[in-house]
UniProtKB/Swiss-Prot annotation:
Organism of provenance: Azotobacter vinelandii (strain DJ / ATCC BAA-1303)
InterPro entries given in the database record: G_ERA_dom (IPR030388), GTP-bd (IPR006073), GTPase_Era-like (IPR005662), KH_dom-like_a/b (IPR015946), KH_dom_type_2 (IPR004044), KH_sf_prok-type (IPR009019), P-loop_NTPase (IPR027417), Small_GTP-bd (IPR005225)
Protein name: GTPase Era
Region (G5): 155-157
Region of interest: G2: 42-46
Pfam families assigned: KH_2, MMR_HSR1
Keywords of the record: Cell inner membrane, Cell membrane, Cytoplasm, GTP-binding, Membrane, Nucleotide-binding, Ribosome biogenesis, RNA-binding, rRNA-binding
Chain spans, region G4: 125-128
Similarity comment text for this entry: Belongs to the TRAFAC class TrmE-Era-EngA-EngB-Septin-like GTPase superfamily. Era GTPase family.
Gene, per the UniProt record: era
GO terms, biological process: ribosomal small subunit assembly
Membrane topology listed for this record: Peripheral membrane protein
Length: 300
């Protein structure tokens, strides 16, 4: 076999309900933090590529928003449409499910998978938390009945358990072909996008259930000056009360958000970062398709 014929390359969609561990799985496969994570469902809002090149194999993972039943706002419709679109024209699908729990939103994903032509791998997450692995068998058997042609792999996205098996199965299902991206490229997203996502992650982690989903981040300025990367980020909310929550008493909360986001950016960009944050009220942005488009929520 020639060197050209030994190359494998393809797209791998990572799908599942919200908050099941898709972004954590991508980060562990890549060996670095790329996709933002939090305990809040629907943290991921956009499809994002995570590219892993290892020898002759280039796997292009597509991290997707969690498919969910809520469809009442333009933002929810955008996320569901984005996740569904990822199932088209990919070479492999990884369906991430919980080790025991099955919900209506898992079923929603399963229903979409009936139309997928390519191979499906079912990654059963948090399997390492069960002391007696026999408890897992009924769930694995049920999953095998639902997806009889799928390979089922118990994993831990957080701790990396059995991910080598999952990656090996992915590699064996990718088509032969030249690599689409340079060996050292790990994503298709810009540095501005990654910076905005880091700020949004810190907001979601700081506020937990205090703040609804109507918050987004826009990078207004991003430039390197000497050894320092200067970033100006605008945090958009829908109501004055939400603005006060983010700022916090005497500005303490937004200060913590800024400190944590800056630290993450310095690791990601390997540069000293000067980060400035502002909070602005933009009423109704999450249910305004034109506003969403202007904020970067565009169809793939």
């Amino acid at each position: 076999m020639t060197e050209e014929n030994s190359l494998r390359c393809g797209y791998v969609a990572i799908v599942g309900r919200p908050n099941v561990g898709k972004s954590t799985l991508l980060n562990h496969i890549l060996g670095q933090k790329l996709a933002i994570t939090s305990r809040k469902p629907q943290t991921t809002r956009h499809n994002m590529l995570g590219i892993k090149t290892e020898g002759d194999v280039q796997a292009i993972y597509v991290d997707t928003p969690g498919l969910h039943k809520q469809n009442d706002k333009a933002l929810n419709r955008y996320m569901n449409k984005t996740a569904s679109a990822a199932l088209k024209d990919v070479d492999v699908v990884i369906f991430v499910v919980d080790r025991m729990r099955w919900t209506e939103e898992d079923q929603l994903v399963l229903d979409r998978l009936q139309y997928v032509q390519g191979p499906v791998l079912v990654a059963v997450n948090k399997a390492d938390r069960l002391e007696d692995k026999v408890e897992l068998l009924p769930h694995l058997q049920w999953l095998a009945q639902q997806l009889p042609n799928a390979e089922i792999v118990p994993i831990s996205a957080l701790h990396g358990h059995n991910l080598d098996t999952l990656e090996r199965l992915v590699a064996g299902r990718l088509p032969q072909g030249e690599h689409f991206f340079p060996e050292d490229q790990i994503t298709d997203r810009s540095s501005r996008f990654l910076a905005a996502e880091l700020v949004r992650e810190k907001i979601m982690r700081q506020l937990g259930a205090e703040l609804p989903y109507q918050v987004t981040v826009e990078i207004e300025d991003f430039k390197q000056q000497g050894q320092v990367l200067h970033i100006h980020a605008l945090i958009l909310v829908e109501r004055e009360g939400q603005k006060k929550i983010i700022i916090g008493e005497k500005g303490e909360r937004i200060k913590r958000i800024g400190q944590e986001a800056r630290q993450g950016m310095e690791v990601l960009f390997d540069s000293k970062v000067m980060l400035n944050l502002w909070v602005k009220v933009k009423g109704g942005w999450s249910d305004d398709e034109r506003a969403l488009h202007s904020l970067g929520y565009r169809d793939s």
